[in-house]
Amino acid sequence: MQDKGMARVLRAGVCASLVWLGMCAVASAAVDVESHVRREEFSQMQLSPGGDYLAATLPRGDRTGLVILRLSDLKPTAQFSLGRNTDIAWFSWANDRRVLLGVAEKIGMLARPRFTGEVVVVDAQDGRGEMLVGERVDDGGAGTRIKPKKAEAVWARLADELPGDPNSVILNVAPFTDDPYSRAERMDVRSGRRVVVARVPVRNAEFLVDHAGVVRAVFGSNTDNMSQLYHRASAEAEWQLVNDERSSRRREYPLGFSADGRTLFLRSDMPRGPDAILALDLASGQRSEVLRDDDVDPMTVIYASTGPREPIGARFMDGRPRTEFFNKDHPDVRLHRLLEQAFEGESPELASRTADGRLALVEVHSDRNSGDFFLFDTATMQARHLVSRRSWLDPLEMSPRRPVSFTARDGLAVHGYLTLPKGG
């Protein structure tokens, strides 16, 4: 009897296993896993200031390259790559013809490429690249004493594009040491020549430039990892300590200046609950809260896309992306609302805009859409589809994701997402 019972259990187990395997086979046949893990066609994308070109990063096998497309017909005018196991950490248009990019490399067993701190400039018309910052800079060797750029063991990151000066940018530069003091330098994007414009009394600094091109705020931390925020009234003024985390018990990170330069917007920790965006009156030193959500931190800050690059709002993610603005009178607010109406059910974001403000590059994504890029003409109010991140995936064939929440036994609200079967 025991043997017969055991046989029945084994038969039932085998049948259940076969049913489970059959279900898995059906599921595998229904879902093309390869199409979902395949790398996207385009990652970052930006319009040139004049609106003639579109720059984009292309992940390809063991490297990520840069391609420049002519906007009128999307034909490539230039391509650039640094070779095997290299990536592009960031890039930005310096002017209508030159693109600056930060170099990253995949080293050893690292899962992600590591930023090397080197800066390269690429010509948008012929794709020629030249290293301007880093140890591998070609400075002409020992045969010349005139060296506009120099090979140096430093890392650099873009601090500001200086829209009013097409030939210069501000870089955040620091040496490769255990105790780095950063400095702000103005660099000529044609020659690579750099001039120090600011030194600061805090390590690991990040610089904030005002709308006149002056470095006026800096955020950093010393060896105790406690942050400090400094401000100065002008390029000639002394740095003034605005916040010290050791005494205030909160971090205040500078986001940007108001259009008139009199207010510094901050993202601040709060004693309880989510972070807030504060407005610091630089004359009086008074802080006022301008934007805060009841449940979630700001996901990203929204900046004005034309004129002075001032913070005007934030994007929050409490289930689905939504935008809130504290400068409700800014013209960009109306543009954001129009785009949200035009792409109802999706999340449109202004990726970049031409210097005259007419053309805007808009990225649209959702729970079922990996990302579509559109060219939006603000004069005609017409949008033209350019490219998709994953053109082989049809959003209509994707399963929707629904935000869900429930309260745990200890009273904690738990938030998550539920992926629904297609048609379910």
Describe the predicted segments one by one.
Residues V387-G424:
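N-terminal cap/lid segment of alpha/beta-hydrolase-fold proteins
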Residues G13-C24:
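Bacterial N-terminal signal peptides
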Residues A29-A360, S366-N369, F376:
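Beta-propeller folds
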Residues H365-S366, F374, Q382-A383, W392-D394:
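Long amphipathic N-terminal alpha/beta scaffold segment
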Residues G313-R315, L375, Q382-S388:
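Short, structured interface segments
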Residues A283, A379, K422-G424:
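Secondary-structure transition/capping motifs at alpha-helix termini
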Residues M1-V9:
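N-terminal secretory signal peptides that target proteins for export/translocation
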